Amino acid sequence: MANKKRSASSSRWLQEHFSDKYVQQAQKKGLRSRAWFKLDEIQQSDKLFKPGMTVVDLGAAPGGWSQYVVTQIGGSGRIIACDILPMDPIVGVDFLQGDFRDELVLKALLERVGESKVQVVMSDMAPNMSGTPAVDIPRSMYLVELALGMCRDVLAPGGSFLVKVFQGDGFDEYLREIRSLFTKVKIRKPDASRARSREVYIVATGRKL
């Protein structure tokens, strides 16, 4: 019975996915993923990216966000991206494949960033979802805490942090933590984000000294 339920749920997800207008637009435009449209909407409202910036992209695969940011920061900019999954190369993106939770991978990522601070840290990381909020939310909160830790390590004063968060236990505390570190914090729910999804995007700008 459980397998039948999973099969029906998977079929519904696939049907919803391929009928999604943003998935269809991404395919037509040759984009890596529908996430490109989420970031485009955030950029239109919050202007996070400018030419010449250095950006860290966590949870980068398949590359929708990196693909978008390249168009905003130009040839003088730089993107350092990381994901546990493989990602096809993108010109202008320095990609590291590995588990961000692993100390050796984190060390390698920090080495790629180097001594200079970055202007934006963005995270689209998410755990493998079980469908059970009591399991999924804590896993997600662990990842977003790691992303915030990366901000503390590499983000320049005045820099910005963009992170996908799933609303649930720990969300309010996490939001308070971000507000203590940044001068302006907004919550965005892009049109390309499915309405039934718990995901929202926290946009934090003006990292405090």
Swiss-Prot record:
Q: Write out the entry's keywords from A to Z.
A: Cytoplasm, Methyltransferase, rRNA processing, S-adenosyl-L-methionine, Transferase
Q: Which gene encodes it?
A: rlmE
| Catalytic activity reported | uridine(2552) in 23S rRNA + S-adenosyl-L-methionine = 2'-O-methyluridine(2552) in 23S rRNA + S-adenosyl-L-homocysteine + H(+)
This protein's GO cellular component annotations are:
cytoplasm
Tell me the GO molecular function terms. Answer: rRNA (uridine-2'-O-)-methyltransferase activity
Q: What is this protein called?
A: Ribosomal RNA large subunit methyltransferase E
Q: Which residues form a coiled coil?
A: none
Origin organism lineage: Bacteria, Pseudomonadati, Pseudomonadota, Gammaproteobacteria, Enterobacterales
Q: Which domain of life does the UniProt lineage start with?
A: Bacteria
By sequence similarity, the record places it as follows: Belongs to the class I-like SAM-binding methyltransferase superfamily. RNA methyltransferase RlmE family.
Q: Locate the active site.
A: 164
